[in-house]
A protein has these predicted regions:
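Hydrophobic alpha-helical packing residues
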Residues: 23-24, 109
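Glycine-rich FAD pyrophosphate-binding loop
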Residues: 24-45
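FAD-binding beta-loop-beta segment adjacent to the flavin cofactor pocket
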Residues: 40, 126-133
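Dinucleotide-binding Rossmann-like beta1-alpha1 core, especially the glycine-rich loop
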Residues: 49-127
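Helical element adjacent to the flavin cofactor pocket in flavoenzyme catalytic cores
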Residues: 141-152
Length: 152
């Protein structure tokens, strides 16, 4: 083992492995990752691993969209599944204030090109029968919502 590296990454969780991955994509070779156990065996392994592109901050939304696309790219490059499951997701409103907020957010997401759309209570219940329709005013559907398997 070498005694000197240009970069040493401490921790092989999602952040450490992402740093190492991106450095190697930039052509860096004088780098090392140090992990005390198995890769992703710490807090990353216990994560819910859910993600979405919805965020009113365009920078955060761009980062979240980049992450979703990166997982797809890694699967394609490696031929290995990351356990990605992208069924989409709903944010629902049961109060007039929440419904107004979702409508305003929808307009922001439209300008960001995210592709989220407002949905009726009937659409939500048809897709998610476990949701009680009583008091449901509507919702916002995000087609880019899903999860990956953090330990597989």
């Amino acid at each position: 083992m070498k005694t000197h590296y240009r970069v040493v990454v401490i921790g092989g969780g999602i952040v450490g492995t992402s740093i190492l991955y991106h450095l190697t994509r930039k052509g860096w070779t004088d780098i090392a990752l140090i992990e005390r156990a198995e890769l992703t065996a710490g807090s990353t392994w216990h994560a819910a691993a859910g993600f979405h592109a919805l965020n009113a901050d365009p920078n955060v939304s761009a980062l979240q969209t980049y992450t979703i696309n990166l997982y797809r790219e890694i699967e394609k490059e490696s031929g290995q599944s990351v356990g990605m499951h992208m069924p989409g997701g709903y944010s629902i409103a049961t109060s007039p204030q929440r419904w107004e907020w979702l409508q305003a957010e929808s307009a922001i997401y439209e300008t960001l090109g995210i592709g989220a759309r407002l949905v009726t209570p009937e659409e939500i219940v048809a897709e998610c029968p476990i949701v009680a329709p009583e008091g449901l005013l509507g919702g916002l559907y995000d087609p880019h919502e899903g999860a990956v398997d953090p330990h597989g």
